[in-house]
Regions:
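His/Met- and acidic-residue-enriched segments that coordinate or traffic transition-metal cofactors
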Residues: 1-134
Length: 134
């Protein structure tokens, strides 16, 4: 339901924001650095929108990345150039593959039009990121 979606979506924003900030400075390819800037901005605005939407419903959103994601964030911070790019592409491709069905399910099942709109917008952004890393 909406609560589970909001929590997964929040986690995605936290992790995408952290990894994208590393991409801005550690990426070997300049297009990945630029993509990092875009993703960091998107994740921040998505999180702001989500926080606003769930505020009246007393839904607790995660504020930190899960342990396995924290390890990934740490590894990315330690890498530079092509090594960074390889791991970042792998992470982003996996993240998109995992999140698309979550977003699709929310779009189909939710009666909250604002959450549906947010899910649709995010889905479009993930598709755009996917094209850039192929």
């Amino acid at each position: 339901g909406d609560i589970a979606f909001a929590q997964k979506f929040s986690t995605m924003n936290i992790v995408q924001s952290a990894t994208a900030k590393s991409a801005e400075t550690h990426a070997g390819r300049s297009d990945f650095a630029t993509l990092g800037t875009t993703i960091a901005q998107d994740a921040t605005s998505q999180q702001t929108a989500l926080t606003t939407l769930v505020a009246p419903h007393a839904i607790a959103l995660p504020t930190t990345a899960p342990k396995e994601d924290q390890m990934l964030i740490k590894r990315l911070k330690a890498l530079h150039g092509p090594a960074f790019d390889r791991l970042y592409i792998r992470y982003l491709a996996r993240e998109i593959t995992l999140m698309k069905p979550v977003l699709d399910a929310e779009i189909l099942a939710s009666s909250n039009t604002d959450l549906v709109k947010l899910a649709k917008n995010t889905n479009a952004k993930l598709s755009a990121y996917q094209e850039q890393i192929q």
